[in-house]
């Protein structure tokens, strides 16, 4: 149990905080092929695949929620010798949760949390945190088999969202004391 927690914490730190040199040991091409979508190599030997739910039109209190704001599924792999650790966060609709969860359990992928970030959305969206350890391509294939039970797009995105948005970004920057950036129509 402590070994699993240590591995999980090291992946979280590597994915979010590490600035060490790139040290990819895995064959991420096999992961991309098995999953059906490629990702990018991150610092700390992490291979991350973004899976934004661009197929969903989610509305919260009359406001459309953009995928870049709160609908971004992702998976991150890190080599552990000839094995890999994977963790991620899958954005799912209510009707997708049960079949995806069942398939992941059958394939030996752990569900570490199921919750929602946004109340009152239509459709309702849920966030399933996952974790697995094993052969990288086998993990990716298991995740693919679960994701195809949802409508999560597994192809490249259709292009970048406009870089201009209708916000006073200078005021936001001054107020926060930091410069932001536009990403997928979100600042």
Residue ranges and their predicted role:
Residues 1-6:
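N-terminal secretory signal peptides that target proteins for export/translocation
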Residues 79-87:
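Acidic/histidine-rich, surface-exposed loop or edge segments in extracytoplasmic proteins
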